Swiss-Prot record:
Enzyme Commission identifier(s): 7.1.1.2
A biological-process GO annotation: mitochondrial electron transport, NADH to ubiquinone
Name of the protein in its database record: NADH-ubiquinone oxidoreductase chain 3
Class of the enzyme per the UniProt entry, highest EC level: translocase
Subunit structure: Core subunit of respiratory chain NADH dehydrogenase (Complex I) which is composed of 45 different subunits.
Membrane topology: Multi-pass membrane protein
Organism of this sequence: Gallus gallus (Chicken)
């Protein structure tokens, strides 16, 4: 227990010291190059602060949700071989149903329509 306390204290002190040194020694001198927008090495064609369509944001969020669904359902074939496969199938069905209902809701609200 004494060794554990020593190791935890040492790691905390080392982390605090490195964080403090980084805060004090950091060179925060913004200039025009650091504050200018960067577009693949070229000067920007227009203002980089223009708002973009919220539909792109919604499509990106939907993509992330369905990508997460795939990541959650990927181990499903191995999980079915466990002692209680019905519990696994119940959770998988629940995940798919929730995402399907969310997609239907988004579709009926017009979130996926591009033309107005």
């Amino acid at each position: 227990m004494n060794t554990l306390t020593f190791m935890l204290s040492l790691s905390f002190l080392l982390s605090a010291a490195l964080t403090t040194m980084n805060f004090w020694l950091a060179q925060m001198a913004p200039d025009t190059e650091k504050l200018s927008p960067y577009e693949c090495g070229f000067d920007p064609l227009g203002s980089a602060r223009l708002p973009f369509s919220i539909r792109f944001f919604l499509v990106a969020i939907l993509f992330l949700l369905f990508d997460l669904e795939i990541a959650l359902l990927l181990p499903l074939p191995w999980a079915i071989q466990l002692a209680h496969p019905m519990m696994t199938l119940t959770w998988a069905t629940t995940i798919i149903a929730l995402l399907t209902f969310g997609l239907i809701y988004e579709w009926t609200q017009g979130g996926l329509e591009w033309a107005e």
